[in-house]
């Protein structure tokens, strides 16, 4: 009887490499970060588990809800879908980087004043998306606000208080310019 030899599948080498740590360099909230990460680790997990910045939330983990939004080079991205190595040499902003010290920024303050926060789980993603929108377009229409928040789901507020907070934030930011 012929002895069977073990043959590894072509994908097994890739699976072995998944356990290796890769060097990672990027800027997070204005500070340089250097670390070693698994190539399969998401940016969400890296930020929350390794850096202990828990403001960014993981809800659906499928890129459908927007609670995990971060800005990568100024563009909102679902950090649950971005692998940590993909932000090599890029700038990442989380909700922790939005506020100025211990004071909320204008958008955060307007969310508070307008009652646009209920359970709060979606709030970091909404505020992060709004930061990107208002940086690109300081005077958005209601339709542009809705389009800018298209990837964010809020199950509590019904969006009216969120839209009012964003309009007031845009107005307040316009007065400061």
Where are these regions (language model features)?
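Signature of N-terminal electron-transfer/Fe-S-associated modules in redox systems
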Residues: 1-177
């Amino acid at each position: 009887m012929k002895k069977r030899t073990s043959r590894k599948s072509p994908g097994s080498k890739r699976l072995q490499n998944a356990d290796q740590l890769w060097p990672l360099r990027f800027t997070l909230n204005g500070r340089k970060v250097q670390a070693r990460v698994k190539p399969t680790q998401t940016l969400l997990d890296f930020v929350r588990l390794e850096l202990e910045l828990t403001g960014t939330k993981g809800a659906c983990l499928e890129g459908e809800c927007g609670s995990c939004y971060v800005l990568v080079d100024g563009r909102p991205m679902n950090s649950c879908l971005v692998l940590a190595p993909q932000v090599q040499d890029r700038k990442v902003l989380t909700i922790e980087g939005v506020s100025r010290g211990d004071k909320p920024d204008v958008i955060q303050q307007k969310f508070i004043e307008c009652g646009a926060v209920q359970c709060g789980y979606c709030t970091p993603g909404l505020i992060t998306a709004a930061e990107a929108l208002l940086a690109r377009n300081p005077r958005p229409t209601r339709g542009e606000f809705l389009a800018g928040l298209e990837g964010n789901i809020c199950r509590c507020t019904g969006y009216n208080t969120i839209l009012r907070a964003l309009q007031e934030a845009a107005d307040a930011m316009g007065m400061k310019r």
